[in-house]
């Protein structure tokens, strides 16, 4: 049977067998099996230093991070550099690279973390978008339903039958009034995901999550007065206010996508 592990998996298996599970032996054995070659020009100095003993590389890494925490933190465990925009972001804020928890936030969040928010956030907002739970966004935006066209015509076929009964009544009364319908579910997924990165405590807390979702409407609408009222009303909740302010770029991006 053909080995599906590939060259890397085969190499790691051989190294693990030879090292007997010892981390120092595994490191030395893997170093010997790696082909010699020049490292990239922007690689940190500790990357191309020979391994004399099991602790030399960790000591070099510790010393290098003290000298240049941003440079040392920009390399993955596999030895490859991270994306350029991440590098630039960390260089602008070197203090963030010094803490592992902050550095982890530079990379995409695992799907299971966002699963807690998807049901109460994205699915609920997407359903209200189709069922008209807020003001219509047909004026001045392309990609939405044109005037006079029933929203049910835009629904996928498997959603038309169970949700058809909601359209027999007045759409705004089908669900409680709350969030607007100016954003598509795909945009909402990006918004909530970005918020989860920057302010996870906002969406992971049951108390602040409901307040945050209820106040997304003035953020993505033209109701300037309501938006100012929303900021004043959340002055006692700093995390919620900061989370809403962090979403302003998404409002501009959504406007450009539909213009």
Swiss-Prot record:
Which InterPro entries did the record assign? FAM220A, SIPAR
Tell me the Gene Ontology biological-process terms attached to this UniProt entry: negative regulation of transcription by RNA polymerase II
Which Gene Ontology terms of cellular component type are present? acrosomal vesicle; nucleus
Per UniProt, the keywords (alphabetical) are:
Cytoplasm, Cytoplasmic vesicle, Nucleus
Please indicate which superkingdom the organism of origin belongs to: Eukaryota
- Indicate, by first and last residue, each region the UniProt record lists as having compositional bias (Basic and acidic residues): 138-152
Subcellular location, principal: nucleus
Which molecular-function annotations from GO does this UniProt entry contain? STAT family protein binding
Tell whether Nucleus is among the UniProt keywords.
Answer: yes
Quote the subunit structure annotation: Interacts with transcriptional activator STAT3; the interaction occurs in both the nucleus and the cytoplasm, is enhanced by IL6 and promotes STAT3 dephosphorylation, leading to negative regulation of STAT3 transcriptional activator activity. Can interact with both unphosphorylated and phosphorylated STAT3 but interacts preferentially with phosphorylated STAT3 in the nucleus. Interacts with protein phosphatase PTPN2/TC45; this promotes interaction of PTPN2 with STAT3, leading to dephosphorylation of STAT3 by PTPN2.
Function of the protein: Promotes dephosphorylation of transcriptional activator STAT3 by interacting with both STAT3 and protein phosphatase PTPN2. This promotes interaction of PTPN2 with STAT3 and mediates STAT3 dephosphorylation by PTPN2, leading to negative regulation of STAT3 transcriptional activator activity. May be required for spermiogenesis or sperm function.
Q: What is this protein called?
A: Protein FAM220A
